[in-house]
Amino acid sequence: MKSIHGGDIYNNKVNMDFSVNINPLGIPHSVKEAMSDALSYADRYPDMACSGLKKAISEYFTQQGCSIQSEDVIPGNGASELFMAIAHAIKPKKAVLLAPGFFGYEYVLRAVGCDIGYFLLDEQSDFSPAARLDALMDMLTDDTDIFFIANPNNPTGYLADSTFMKQIIGHCKEKHIYVVADECFMGFCEKNYSVLSLLCDYDNLIVVRAFTKLFAIPGVRLGYMLSKNEAVRQNVQRNLPEWNVSVLAQMAGEACIRAVSYTHLRAHET
Protein backbone atom coordinates (compact mmCIF):
# COMPACT_ATOMS: atom_id res chain seq x y z
CA MET A 1 0.00 0.00 0.00
CA LYS A 2 1.27 3.46 -0.89
CA SER A 3 2.13 5.52 2.17
CA ILE A 4 -0.14 8.56 2.53
CA HIS A 5 0.96 9.72 5.98
CA GLY A 6 4.17 9.90 7.92
CA GLY A 7 7.71 9.02 6.97
CA ASP A 8 7.06 5.36 6.11
CA ILE A 9 9.31 4.22 8.96
CA TYR A 10 8.65 0.54 8.30
CA ASN A 11 10.22 0.63 4.85
CA ASN A 12 12.79 3.39 5.34
CA LYS A 13 15.34 4.40 7.93
CA VAL A 14 13.89 7.58 9.43
CA ASN A 15 15.75 9.32 12.24
CA MET A 16 13.47 12.34 12.65
CA ASP A 17 9.96 12.25 11.21
CA PHE A 18 8.60 15.80 11.12
CA SER A 19 5.43 14.64 9.37
CA VAL A 20 4.14 13.02 12.57
CA ASN A 21 3.33 15.79 15.03
CA ILE A 22 3.02 14.05 18.38
CA ASN A 23 4.09 15.16 21.84
CA PRO A 24 7.92 14.98 21.99
CA LEU A 25 7.71 14.52 25.77
CA GLY A 26 6.34 11.03 25.34
CA ILE A 27 3.65 8.88 26.89
CA PRO A 28 2.57 9.68 30.48
CA HIS A 29 3.70 7.05 32.97
CA SER A 30 0.13 6.44 34.15
CA VAL A 31 -0.96 5.67 30.58
CA LYS A 32 1.92 3.23 30.15
CA GLU A 33 0.83 1.49 33.35
CA ALA A 34 -2.77 1.28 32.14
CA MET A 35 -1.68 -0.30 28.87
CA SER A 36 0.46 -2.79 30.74
CA ASP A 37 -2.47 -3.69 33.01
CA ALA A 38 -4.68 -4.11 29.94
CA LEU A 39 -2.68 -7.14 28.85
CA SER A 40 -4.34 -9.09 31.67
CA TYR A 41 -7.67 -8.57 29.88
CA ALA A 42 -6.45 -9.42 26.37
CA ASP A 43 -7.99 -12.89 26.63
CA ARG A 44 -11.50 -11.45 26.31
CA TYR A 45 -13.38 -9.31 23.81
CA PRO A 46 -13.45 -5.59 24.58
CA ASP A 47 -16.59 -3.79 25.71
CA MET A 48 -18.34 -3.19 22.39
CA ALA A 49 -20.10 -0.11 23.80
CA CYS A 50 -16.89 1.39 25.25
CA SER A 51 -19.01 2.30 28.29
CA GLY A 52 -16.19 3.23 30.65
CA LEU A 53 -14.38 5.33 28.07
CA LYS A 54 -17.54 7.17 27.01
CA LYS A 55 -18.38 7.91 30.64
CA ALA A 56 -14.88 9.22 31.32
CA ILE A 57 -14.97 11.51 28.27
CA SER A 58 -18.45 12.86 29.03
CA GLU A 59 -17.62 13.51 32.69
CA TYR A 60 -14.39 15.29 31.78
CA PHE A 61 -16.03 17.70 29.35
CA THR A 62 -19.00 18.25 31.65
CA GLN A 63 -16.53 19.37 34.32
CA GLN A 64 -15.11 21.78 31.73
CA GLY A 65 -18.54 23.34 31.28
CA CYS A 66 -19.70 21.46 28.18
CA SER A 67 -22.92 19.45 28.31
CA ILE A 68 -21.64 16.15 26.90
CA GLN A 69 -23.53 12.93 27.62
CA SER A 70 -22.13 9.42 27.19
CA GLU A 71 -24.46 8.83 24.25
CA ASP A 72 -22.96 11.86 22.46
CA VAL A 73 -19.58 10.09 22.28
CA ILE A 74 -18.50 7.55 19.65
CA PRO A 75 -14.98 6.15 20.15
CA GLY A 76 -13.06 4.88 17.16
CA ASN A 77 -9.85 3.23 16.03
CA GLY A 78 -8.19 6.60 15.66
CA ALA A 79 -9.69 9.75 14.15
CA SER A 80 -9.09 8.34 10.67
CA GLU A 81 -11.60 5.52 11.17
CA LEU A 82 -14.17 8.04 12.34
CA PHE A 83 -13.60 10.31 9.33
CA MET A 84 -14.22 7.33 7.05
CA ALA A 85 -17.35 6.31 8.98
CA ILE A 86 -18.67 9.88 8.82
CA ALA A 87 -18.15 9.97 5.05
CA HIS A 88 -19.99 6.66 4.59
CA ALA A 89 -22.76 7.72 6.99
CA ILE A 90 -23.48 11.08 5.36
CA LYS A 91 -22.63 10.07 1.77
CA PRO A 92 -21.88 13.64 0.64
CA LYS A 93 -22.01 14.52 -3.04
CA LYS A 94 -20.04 17.75 -2.69
CA ALA A 95 -17.51 18.84 -0.07
CA VAL A 96 -15.32 21.85 0.66
CA LEU A 97 -11.82 21.51 2.11
CA LEU A 98 -9.21 24.06 3.12
CA ALA A 99 -5.86 23.84 1.34
CA PRO A 100 -3.29 23.23 2.60
CA GLY A 101 -4.96 20.78 4.93
CA PHE A 102 -4.91 17.22 6.24
CA PHE A 103 -5.00 14.70 3.38
CA GLY A 104 -7.17 12.29 5.36
CA TYR A 105 -10.32 14.27 4.57
CA GLU A 106 -9.75 14.00 0.83
CA TYR A 107 -8.96 10.31 1.24
CA VAL A 108 -12.29 9.45 2.87
CA LEU A 109 -14.31 11.69 0.55
CA ARG A 110 -12.78 10.06 -2.52
CA ALA A 111 -13.77 6.70 -1.06
CA VAL A 112 -17.45 7.66 -1.31
CA GLY A 113 -17.19 9.33 -4.72
CA CYS A 114 -17.61 12.88 -3.43
CA ASP A 115 -16.71 15.94 -5.51
CA ILE A 116 -14.30 18.22 -3.65
CA GLY A 117 -13.83 21.97 -3.86
CA TYR A 118 -10.67 23.47 -2.38
CA PHE A 119 -10.56 26.85 -0.64
CA LEU A 120 -6.96 28.02 -1.01
CA LEU A 121 -5.40 29.63 2.06
CA ASP A 122 -2.99 32.53 1.59
CA GLU A 123 0.50 32.44 3.09
CA GLN A 124 0.57 36.25 3.26
CA SER A 125 -2.32 36.14 5.75
CA ASP A 126 -0.70 33.31 7.77
CA PHE A 127 -3.05 30.80 6.12
CA SER A 128 -5.98 32.33 7.97
CA PRO A 129 -9.41 31.34 6.61
CA ALA A 130 -10.87 34.22 8.61
CA ALA A 131 -8.94 36.69 6.45
CA ARG A 132 -11.20 35.71 3.53
CA LEU A 133 -14.34 34.86 5.45
CA ASP A 134 -16.76 36.24 2.85
CA ALA A 135 -15.09 34.29 0.05
CA LEU A 136 -15.23 31.09 2.09
CA MET A 137 -18.91 31.60 2.85
CA ASP A 138 -19.57 32.22 -0.84
CA MET A 139 -18.01 28.84 -1.58
CA LEU A 140 -20.14 27.07 1.03
CA THR A 141 -23.30 27.02 -1.07
CA ASP A 142 -26.63 25.20 -0.83
CA ASP A 143 -25.34 22.30 -2.92
CA THR A 144 -22.46 21.63 -0.50
CA ASP A 145 -23.03 18.69 1.84
CA ILE A 146 -20.02 18.72 4.14
CA PHE A 147 -17.13 20.96 5.22
CA PHE A 148 -14.05 19.67 7.03
CA ILE A 149 -11.97 22.10 9.09
CA ALA A 150 -9.04 21.32 11.38
CA ASN A 151 -8.58 23.70 14.29
CA PRO A 152 -5.73 24.23 14.73
CA ASN A 153 -4.99 23.54 11.09
CA ASN A 154 -2.77 20.65 10.11
CA PRO A 155 -0.17 21.39 8.72
CA THR A 156 -0.15 25.21 8.99
CA GLY A 157 -0.83 25.38 12.72
CA TYR A 158 -3.26 28.30 12.31
CA LEU A 159 -5.73 28.49 15.21
CA ALA A 160 -9.11 30.00 14.32
CA ASP A 161 -10.88 31.84 17.12
CA SER A 162 -14.34 31.10 18.47
CA THR A 163 -15.99 34.01 16.64
CA PHE A 164 -14.87 32.74 13.24
CA MET A 165 -15.82 29.16 14.00
CA LYS A 166 -19.30 30.15 15.17
CA GLN A 167 -19.84 32.26 12.05
CA ILE A 168 -18.86 29.39 9.76
CA ILE A 169 -20.87 26.76 11.63
CA GLY A 170 -23.90 29.05 11.71
CA HIS A 171 -23.63 29.78 7.99
CA CYS A 172 -23.33 26.07 7.25
CA LYS A 173 -26.39 25.31 9.36
CA GLU A 174 -28.42 27.76 7.27
CA LYS A 175 -27.20 26.00 4.12
CA HIS A 176 -27.78 22.51 5.60
CA ILE A 177 -24.07 21.70 5.47
CA TYR A 178 -22.44 19.36 7.98
CA VAL A 179 -19.29 20.75 9.63
CA VAL A 180 -16.65 18.27 10.78
CA ALA A 181 -14.36 20.11 13.21
CA ASP A 182 -11.10 18.22 13.65
CA GLU A 183 -9.69 19.21 17.05
CA CYS A 184 -6.96 16.59 17.28
CA PHE A 185 -4.32 19.24 18.02
CA MET A 186 -6.44 21.45 20.30
CA GLY A 187 -4.80 19.97 23.40
CA PHE A 188 -1.53 21.72 22.50
CA CYS A 189 -3.16 25.16 22.50
CA GLU A 190 -3.04 27.46 25.52
CA LYS A 191 -6.09 29.28 24.13
CA ASN A 192 -9.01 26.89 24.02
CA TYR A 193 -11.09 27.69 20.95
CA SER A 194 -12.92 24.38 20.96
CA VAL A 195 -16.43 24.36 19.47
CA LEU A 196 -17.70 21.72 21.89
CA SER A 197 -19.88 24.31 23.62
CA LEU A 198 -21.72 24.84 20.31
CA LEU A 199 -22.85 21.23 19.94
CA CYS A 200 -26.17 21.79 21.69
CA ASP A 201 -27.13 24.63 19.35
CA TYR A 202 -25.86 23.25 16.05
CA ASP A 203 -27.06 19.81 14.98
CA ASN A 204 -24.91 20.08 11.84
CA LEU A 205 -21.72 20.09 13.93
CA ILE A 206 -19.53 17.02 14.41
CA VAL A 207 -16.35 17.24 16.50
CA VAL A 208 -13.54 14.70 16.17
CA ARG A 209 -10.66 14.39 18.61
CA ALA A 210 -7.90 11.87 19.27
CA PHE A 211 -5.55 10.83 22.04
CA THR A 212 -2.79 10.31 19.47
CA LYS A 213 -1.06 13.68 19.51
CA LEU A 214 -1.05 15.01 23.06
CA PHE A 215 -0.43 11.64 24.70
CA ALA A 216 2.00 10.37 22.04
CA ILE A 217 0.16 7.09 21.38
CA PRO A 218 -0.37 6.90 17.59
CA GLY A 219 0.27 3.16 17.65
CA VAL A 220 -2.64 2.57 20.03
CA ARG A 221 -5.21 4.03 17.57
CA LEU A 222 -7.82 5.85 19.62
CA GLY A 223 -10.06 8.79 18.79
CA TYR A 224 -13.63 9.85 19.44
CA MET A 225 -16.46 11.73 17.79
CA LEU A 226 -18.95 14.02 19.52
CA SER A 227 -22.34 15.03 18.17
CA LYS A 228 -25.76 15.95 19.53
CA ASN A 229 -27.42 14.76 16.31
CA GLU A 230 -28.84 11.34 17.11
CA ALA A 231 -29.47 10.42 13.47
CA VAL A 232 -25.86 11.21 12.57
CA ARG A 233 -24.54 9.22 15.53
CA GLN A 234 -26.64 6.20 14.61
CA ASN A 235 -25.51 6.30 10.98
CA VAL A 236 -21.86 6.67 11.96
CA GLN A 237 -22.13 3.80 14.44
CA ARG A 238 -23.64 1.59 11.73
CA ASN A 239 -20.58 2.24 9.60
CA LEU A 240 -18.13 1.08 12.27
CA PRO A 241 -17.16 -2.56 12.83
CA GLU A 242 -17.95 -4.29 16.09
CA TRP A 243 -15.19 -4.32 18.73
CA ASN A 244 -13.32 -1.61 16.84
CA VAL A 245 -11.68 -0.25 20.02
CA SER A 246 -9.41 -2.75 21.76
CA VAL A 247 -9.19 -3.42 25.49
CA LEU A 248 -5.76 -1.79 25.54
CA ALA A 249 -7.02 1.32 23.72
CA GLN A 250 -10.05 1.71 25.99
CA MET A 251 -7.98 1.45 29.17
CA ALA A 252 -5.33 3.78 27.74
CA GLY A 253 -8.03 6.32 26.89
CA GLU A 254 -9.49 6.27 30.39
CA ALA A 255 -5.99 6.78 31.79
CA CYS A 256 -5.44 9.72 29.43
CA ILE A 257 -8.63 11.36 30.67
CA ARG A 258 -7.43 10.96 34.26
CA ALA A 259 -4.09 12.59 33.38
CA VAL A 260 -5.58 16.09 33.26
CA SER A 261 -2.63 17.74 35.00
CA TYR A 262 -0.30 16.18 32.43
CA THR A 263 -2.24 17.65 29.53
CA HIS A 264 -2.26 21.14 31.01
CA LEU A 265 1.47 21.02 31.77
CA ARG A 266 2.45 19.60 28.39
CA ALA A 267 0.30 22.08 26.46
CA HIS A 268 2.20 24.88 28.21
CA GLU A 269 5.63 23.30 27.67
CA THR A 270 5.11 22.45 24.00
Residue ranges, per PLM feature:
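Conserved N-terminal alpha-helix of the aminotransferase class I/II PLP-enzyme fold
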Residues: 37-76
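Short acidic capping loops at alpha-helix termini that bridge into adjacent secondary structure
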Residues: 67-73, 94, 143, 176, ...
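Conserved beta-loop-alpha segment that forms the PLP phosphate-binding cup at the N-terminus of a helix
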Residues: 50-54, 69-93, 223
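Conserved small/polar residues in nucleotide/adenosyl-binding loops
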Residues: 263-270
